[in-house]
Amino acid sequence: MKLQSILQFFFVLPILPAVANKATSACRCLYGQPCWPDENEFTALASRISQPLLHPVPPESVCYPTSAPSGDCSIVIANYTNGDWRSDQPGAMQNTNFETFIFHNDTISACYLNTTLGIPCGQGSVPPVGVDARSASDVQAAVNFAKQHNLKLVVKGTGHDFLGRSTARGSFLIWTHHMKKTVYNPNFVPEGAPVTTKNTFNGDFVLVFFVFQVTDHISAVTLGTGVQWHDAYDFAQKQGRSVVGGAAASVGAAGGWVMGGGHGPLSPMFGLGTFVPICPTLLKFMI
């Protein structure tokens, strides 16, 4: 980055909060506002996707009312700090503070595991509705729906995002957690290669990684956007191969870990994860 660019960044940064505050009130349509889609519009969306619509709630909600908690409350208590379990819950974040919401008057909407506080269970920042995406067409249908209705859109794979961008109060969720496609190709050829090239793989919303071996051709594993590192490691091991990944096995392999640099145990030998993908498949939308 040039020095001029750095200086411009520091001069612009102080005015950003003021600009953002002016725009937030009318930025996106949120749940509970008159602009929110009605039941018929959500029914129409449901007919275009492969799975029923999600209605996420904070996982602690099964412990309420305190006078008659659900039988699932014991499961929540037993797995509350389990990263794999939390990634399986559409309404759970890895950092529970991102499930809460603080209003301008400093009141809080949250659902606490400690039911002795006497505070009612609230939705907090957990999206009230979403799409359980299993394919590229599911994702496209969800994005187009959000665009049509000007909804605040969030995407969650495992909920590890350190900035809490996997969730937002009153938003519309795309949950990619079940897009678990895994393919091993010992002679990988990227899509779009010359027609005479063999073994071309036509991806479906995936990320393709090198897997390491000593040969004169490219060997690769294709991972769906919902694959977690424990899935990827188990799959690569069955092929007798290794893949550069993160130390936390519950983190998504094709998400923020790659985009944020991707440091892992094999990085000193094979480099950062951001340099390993060789053929990401992206979806195009008309904005």
Regions found by a protein language model. Give the residues of each.
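N-terminal accessory segments
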Residues: K2-L272
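Active-site and channel-lining beta-strand-loop segments
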Residues: L272-I287
